[in-house]
């Protein structure tokens, strides 16, 4: 990577936000494909931490150590984000970053607006349903994605069972985890308590 990168210790709270897809123009700008629709973080943080992932076919090879680049300018361009990084001054230098994962410190994210949440904060939250009048565990949020209209929670089904110290994962007859896709919209989500790692909804339990 370029000598413009800062090689200090990476923050412990790095969150992967996208991947550098290509160079953009001839003045060293890069184009990033965000992992989610919440690309505003890429535009607002002052530094990106770039990591070159290990080749999937290479055994024993690990990803590179994250290095920080100062973000001089960044803007949305279609479904991507284009940015100018300090020390990256021409297309060749930008192309050398192709494929790098783009991360940022969670502590550097701007505060979300009321009733808005960063997707990364929803992962790991327990989702409960009161569709039948009683609050019951549906499962734990494993992933959040955009279906083009709104965010969707991918929930790994779990159930509280007598005699068990914690929730028990539910599986199908072949032993595969049961999943539920729950729209993350006001019509179904009643309350989000990030401190308690809990989301309450009226999504029906469908055993």
Curated annotation (Swiss-Prot):
Name the SUPFAM superfamilies on file: PRC-barrel domain, Translation proteins
One annotated GO molecular function is: ribosome binding
GO CC terms of this entry: cytoplasm; ribosome
List localization entries. Answer: Cytoplasm
**Pfam families annotated for this entry?**
PRC_RimM, RimM
Some GO term, biological process aspect, for this entry: which one? Answer: rRNA processing
Q: Has the keyword ATP-binding been applied to this entry?
A: no
Primary location group: cytoplasm
Note whether Transport occurs among the keywords. Answer: no
Could you tell me the keywords of this UniProt record?
Chaperone, Cytoplasm, Ribosome biogenesis, rRNA processing
List, for all copies, the residue spans of the domain called PRC barrel. 114-207
Q: What domain of life does the UniProt record list for this protein's source?
A: Bacteria
InterPro entries tied to this protein:
PRC_barrel-like_sf, PRC_RimM, RimM, RimM_N, RimM_N_sf, Transl_B-barrel_sf
Recorded hits in PANTHER family, A to Z, give: RIBOSOME MATURATION FACTOR RIMM (PTHR33692:SF1)
The family classification in the record reads: Belongs to the RimM family.
Q: What is known of its domains?
A: The PRC barrel domain binds ribosomal protein uS19.
Q: How does it assemble?
A: Binds ribosomal protein uS19.
UniProt function note: An accessory protein needed during the final step in the assembly of 30S ribosomal subunit, possibly for assembly of the head region. Essential for efficient processing of 16S rRNA. May be needed both before and after RbfA during the maturation of 16S rRNA. It has affinity for free ribosomal 30S subunits but not for 70S ribosomes.
Any idea what this protein is called?
Answer: Ribosome maturation factor RimM
Which organism's genome codes for this protein? Bordetella parapertussis (strain 12822 / ATCC BAA-587 / NCTC 13253)
